[in-house]
């Protein structure tokens, strides 16, 4: 045996290996393993099609298994009303299995590709007129999370949230992405360079905190 070279690792990450399961069967198998293995599970839900399907599958399986889940939804303020209505409808549909629904309406910064004059967008920015008001039960208090810093980026927030949610114990943040949408998304799952939660679970990614 010889050590796997970088080129070999890259090639192994490029090619898909068909499984004997279809996508739905594989997703249910992975979600079931997660619910059975980890004591705390949170679905990252954007209101879009991929994360919406992930929430449906996870909540339905949790209901069948008598488990509870949490949901993270980051409200970007300038969102379509139909998206907000959809988020609210799923929240109500699975209220029996959702232990905590973290509806985030805090100032967060992200890239803005819609303006040449404002390359970054900060939702819920203090002292400006908002596009719409957040729900009454949304998290708007900057002191709710010990890690929160005003205007922190979306990427920083989700990393810190995952660490906070884990409570320094094994936990899962569930995301729904389709590898066919882009090569970057495929590599995010298939890469051999990432740290996995378990060696035989290549679809997992381990965070430094162990979740």
Predicted regions and their residues:
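ATP-dependent adenylation/nucleotidyltransferase module used to activate substrates
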Residues: 2-211
């Amino acid at each position: 045996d010889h050590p796997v070279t970088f080129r070999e690792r890259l090639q192994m990450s490029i090619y898909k290996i068909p499984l004997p399961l279809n996508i739905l069967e594989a997703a249910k198998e992975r979600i079931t393993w997660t619910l059975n293995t980890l004591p705390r599970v949170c679905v990252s839900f954007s209101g879009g099609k991929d994360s919406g399907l992930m929430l449906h599958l996870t909540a339905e399986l949790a209901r069948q298994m008598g488990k509870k889940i949490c949901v993270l939804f980051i409200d970007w303020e300038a969102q379509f009303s139909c998206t907000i209505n959809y988020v609210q409808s799923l929240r109500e549909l699975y209220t029996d299995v959702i232990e905590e629904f973290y509806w985030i309406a805090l100032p967060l910064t992200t890239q803005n590709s819609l303006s040449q004059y404002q390359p970054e967008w900060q939702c819920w920015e203090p002292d400006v007129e908002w596009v719409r008001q957040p729900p009454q039960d949304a998290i708007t208090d900057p002191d709710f999370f010990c890690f929160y810093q005003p205007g922190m980026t979306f990427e920083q927030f989700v990393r810190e949230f995952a660490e906070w949610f884990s409570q320094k114990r094994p936990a899962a943040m569930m995301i729904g992405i389709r590898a066919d949408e882009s090569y970057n998304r495929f590599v995010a799952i298939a890469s051999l360079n990432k740290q996995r939660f378990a060696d035989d679970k290549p679809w997992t990614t381990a965070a430094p905190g162990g979740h």
